Amino acid sequence: MNTILAFDIETVPDVQGIRTLYELPSSLPDDEVVLFAQQKRRAQTGGDFMQHHLHQIVAISCCMRWGQDKVHVGTIGEMDDGEEVVIAKFFELIEKHTPQLVSWNGGGFDLPVLHYRSLIYGINAARYWDMGDGDFGDSRDFKWNNYISRYHQRHCDLMDLLALYQPRANVPLDDMAKLCGFPGKLGMDGSKVWDAFHAGRLKEIRNYCETDAVNTYLMYLRFCLVSGRFDADEYEMEIKRIRNYLSAQTEDKPHWAEFVQAWK
């Protein structure tokens, strides 16, 4: 099986970036900086969702499937790793494995955020950005199939693909996962991440991000079934593989116990 990397990111408003752009004093508390930026955004758009470049990445979680029977779910980096380190490690993973990336709205959110944040830090991601003119042995192949072009296959944005690239047809991962019999979100969602981060609950955010990565992977497996990439037996085998993997983690990682219990 080709290496599959289903991923998800969690973000919070970039407090330092907001301070810089609006020349806010260092004495202003972080929560007030965020409130200021949200008010500005509401005045501009009617909503408080920050522009992509003002999202600080606090977690990147992956569900990776490779080789004959290998699967791993985890969050990149250690708890005390900064944003720059985590982003660099994500692109190093791509550099090492050249996986099939799978996301839900990754083209609309996750990857653009990663682009802007890696630009801020000056992170090298040559393999990821290869569009046929790189120095890798197979770079020529990337002219026709790369991570960047919307209709290429190295990155499969499932939401975009299933919506036939029509934004009005986009639907939430949580809805589709639950309709397909998968757990979906359990307790936390993106709107609660800033409050959790501000309260020091980074571990909870990382756990939530991991469940979103697995939900994304499960949706990809279902897509492989309906698109004919898997027959029914192959699909059931892959579903059983990831379910058994998660079940084996439940003693040490309670979020997987909750996830498996919620799985119909």
Question: Which ranges hold each PLM region?
Answer:
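Short C-terminal domain-edge/linker segments immediately following a structured domain
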Residues: 34-42, 90-93, 132-137, 238-240, ...
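Exposed alpha-helical structural elements
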Residues: 17, 32-35, 89, 172, ...
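Metal-dependent phosphoesterase core characteristic of DEDDh/y 3'-5' exonuclease domains
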Residues: 2, 55-58, 62-80, 98-207, ...
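C-terminal accessory extensions appended to soluble enzyme cores
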Residues: 234-264
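Generic alpha-helical secondary structure signal
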Residues: 26, 40, 94, 120, ...
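Charged, low-complexity, helix-prone segments enriched in Lys/Glu/Asp/Gln
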Residues: 22, 31-46, 209, 223, ...
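Conserved non-catalytic scaffold segment of RNase H-like nuclease domains
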Residues: 1-116
